[in-house]
Amino acid sequence: MAKVYANANKVAARYVETRDAVRDERNKVTRRAKANLARQNSTTRITDEGYFPATITEQDGDVDFHTILNAPNALALEFGHAPSGFFAGTDTKPPEATYILTRAAIGGTVS
């Protein structure tokens, strides 16, 4: 019978080659996310030109490596939302989901 050690996952996750491979994959996701964000920023808007307070950053953890979308309402930017603010209560098409991080993570289009 095989023996499974309680800390085997922790040891494997902290192995240098594993960390390097995970970091490399995260870096690919970050590059794609920055490109997706740049494309989204080039669309028409109601805000001043050059005003797009969203950025893509990275964070290294003990085990995980993250690509992060920083924005005033990152969830609404990623997945869309109902009209609000100036457009609340109007017959306005809701902003489409941009899937900046989602498309970056899967490396393609969202079905």
Curated annotation (Swiss-Prot):
InterPro entries in UniProt: DUF5403
Pfam families for the chain: DUF5403
Lineage: superkingdom: Viruses
Protein name: Gene 21 protein
